[in-house]
């Protein structure tokens, strides 16, 4: 999977929005395919116009576990957005995930203002889902 730093660098290098959209689609194509068995209603992200599934894996410290995520979408651009979301959050501790401002990152790479309202809402739904998963893994 492409690192967040690499994604940010690549976006800075691409001047045209058509090239940036192609890059988002490429990121999605490079995302490991989620097994069909994981594409359940329980893993489906509500609030996305396209179908999006997220699976959370927790390891390590029960008080502040390390979370990794798998993601999938049936739409090319959204699948690329899933890849960026996973680059932002996957492999981090639950406490760190709750503090990350992913929308700010999408703003810095200039992508948020170029998304349709449906895609932006779906992106927010993915972020809320991941943050909710992280908050649910932390002690009350």
Curated annotation (Swiss-Prot):
InterPro entries: Fe-S_metab-assoc_dom. It holds the Pfam family SufE. Belongs to the SufE family. PANTHER family: SUFE-LIKE PROTEIN 2, CHLOROPLASTIC, SULFUR ACCEPTOR PROTEIN CSDE. This is Uncharacterized SufE-like protein R01000. It comes from Rhizobium meliloti (strain 1021) (Ensifer meliloti).
């Amino acid at each position: 999977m492409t690192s967040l730093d690499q994604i940010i660098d690549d976006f800075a290098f691409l001047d045209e929005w058509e090239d940036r959209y192609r890059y988002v689609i490429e990121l999605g194509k490079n995302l490991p395919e989620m097994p069909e068995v994981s594409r359940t209603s329980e893993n489906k992200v509500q609030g996305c116009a396209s179908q999006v599934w997220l699976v959370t894996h927790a390891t390590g410290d029960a008080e502040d576990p390390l979370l990794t995520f798998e993601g999938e979408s049936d739409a090319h651009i959204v699948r690329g957005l899933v890849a960026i979301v996973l680059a932002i959050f996957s492999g981090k501790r639950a406490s760190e995930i709750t503090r990350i401002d992913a929308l700010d990152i999408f703003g810095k790479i200039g992508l948020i203002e170029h998304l349709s309202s449906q895609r932006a809402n779906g992106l927010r739904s993915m972020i809320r889902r991941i943050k909710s998963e992280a908050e649910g893994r932390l002690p009350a």
